[in-house]
């Protein structure tokens, strides 16, 4: 496994106020990953928490449950507004929530990233697997161990969406400006390169 090669300077660490949506799912491993990088992490459960951060991760989990809880906690419009102004990264179920079309009538995605997704397209829980694929970070192509758990598939990429990672020909990592999505779970490995890449993403210029 490739080791992380980007090291944040001590005087930069306090600048990162990372939020992780903590309604359900795989938020704690993301927290640990960012804390290893010296970041301040907030587990986001309400609008007040959103106001404390400058970037957000929507983690993996059960997308139908996350969808319901977003509405239950009145977070839908605040999340849309946040995603229009600041960096957001969606992993697995988070990718589904950021997409324009989830292919599932039970899910009303946030429609922030111009992609379509298909739930569980790489199989259900018993079909979870890992595969080494290619990612492009800062213009360089490298290998990355990708862990897929009931992973969604990106079925359409919009014109403004850049493919940054592929596995067997499928795009499994993509970026649209200040928004990032991955079908796989980088937080389930010890490789922090994608977490570091997300930290370097800038909000849109106003």
Describe the predicted segments one by one.
Residues 41-42, 88, 179:
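Hydrophobic anchor at the start of a short beta-strand
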Residues 23, 91-93, 113, 150, ...:
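A secondary-structure boundary/capping signal
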Residues 27, 50, 97, 104, ...:
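Flexible, glycine-rich phosphate/dinucleotide-binding loops
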Residues 2-9, 119-206:
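Amide-donor transfer/coupling interface in amidating biosynthetic enzymes
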Residues 63-134:
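Cysteine-nucleophile active-site neighborhood
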Residues 58, 90, 182:
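Redox-cofactor binding/interface segments in oxidoreductases and associated redox assembly factors
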Residues 1-72, 78-81, 192-196, 200-206:
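N-terminal beta1-alpha1 cap of cysteine-dependent amidohydrolase-like domains
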